[in-house]
Amino acid sequence: MVDAKAAGVMFTINPVNGDVSKVVIEGSFGFGEAVVSGNVTPDRYLVDKVTLVIEERVISDKGSEFVYNPKTKEMEYIELPPDQRKVQCLEDREVIEITRLAKKVEAHFGCPQDTEWSISRSLPFPESIFLVQARPESVWGKKKKESVLGKKTGFDLLFEKALTPTKIKV
């Protein structure tokens, strides 16, 4: 198990609009359960997949984190101190490295991915970043792609052109 200082989800496609040139990263302090379950509003980063530029960052007020309690040997939510609630859970270099991993996992599987990641407290950067789950993105990946020809087939367009009268100047 990763001793997570931060964790969350990452999409190799913008899940809001299907933009394949963007990576969306959401995260919070502690283990990813807080993000996946919706118990916290995560920080959100929109990154250009080609330039690795962070185009948008929304730092949320995170009230708690999901952590391992070594005394009880159980996972639990603990309240964050007020001065830490609006602190960014990721450094910019971590956002960029997660984006690099996003590109690799998408290239490996050949389609946009919905992944979960975790950053270890005890390992140095970038060895501290782990992808703990990857699966095909399920919303935009299932949508039927609109043909560049519209609803007509290539044959329909060719046949239409062949039957269209043309004027020939003599």
Residue map of PLM features:
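Conserved mixed alpha/beta core segments that line enzyme active sites in large multi-domain catalysts
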Residues: 1-170
